[in-house]
Amino acid sequence: MAYRMEGLPERVTVYEVGPRDGLQNESAIVPVEVKAEFIDRLADAGHTVVEATSFVHPKWVPQLADAAELLGRLDRRPGVRYPVLVPNERGLDRALELGVTEIAIFASATETFAAKNLNRTLESQFDMFEPVVARALEHGLDVRAYVSMCFGDPWEGPTPIEQVVAVGERLLGLGCYQLSLGDTIGVGTPGHVTALIGAFGGPDRLAVHFHDTYGQALGNTLAALKAGVTTVDASTGGIGGCPYAESATGNLATEDLVWMLRGLGIETGLDLDKLVSTSTWLAERLGRPSSSRVVQALAKG
């Protein structure tokens, strides 16, 4: 039974990041055939966007060193997008060679994380992004931008809202079609979410990406929906974190998100039973239980 709440959208796009943001943080290398089946299962469950992999140098993210082989194995379905993360122009070159049609770039809202993750300053990171976005747009690619540490980081504490907006507006100004606001270490709370989204002056080109470190991901998501956001990033079984932020724990679990949205009468186009089955299947291959509360509860009957 669904119970609507006033002021929420009729439909939400769940942007699945498990194959990229989830698997990049695994200690063991997941075989490429498992990754390909994982992505195919997600598409079969109704996902219209599945972030497939990353072209970050294998030295930094060895778990995704098989990006080219994986893309070659994908059974691409009509109506499903398979974006990839691209860190720089070399990564873009590889993506273009493989016929990718959508990419994502990854920015920082704080100086310290920009230095640790990108080896750049807050300002100089744009020297890297500008040619990537410009060339991608010239080739007809869609470009999405992630901004990490939007609510706080382990070194600088709370991130000033105006600092996040300044970074985000510049990325949108480059031509990115969407900005995903990331709570990389999970310190955000619903009021903070409302304030940040409101500071952008409109939610139309915003998405949210919450980690559940302090158990706030679903509450933060509800606040974002009330503020007008209609795209939410999530990861199968809550897998993932950030290789460069030790205090970052798992992503918002796709199954938990869909359970809440279904209860609110919000359409997603997703089959929860298939999502749970996929989460259980993946957990068996990763050698540990799914961290999704919904998957755990349904497993107990």
Regions from the PLM with identified roles:
Residues M1-G301:
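Catalytic cores and adjacent flexible loops of soluble metabolic enzymes
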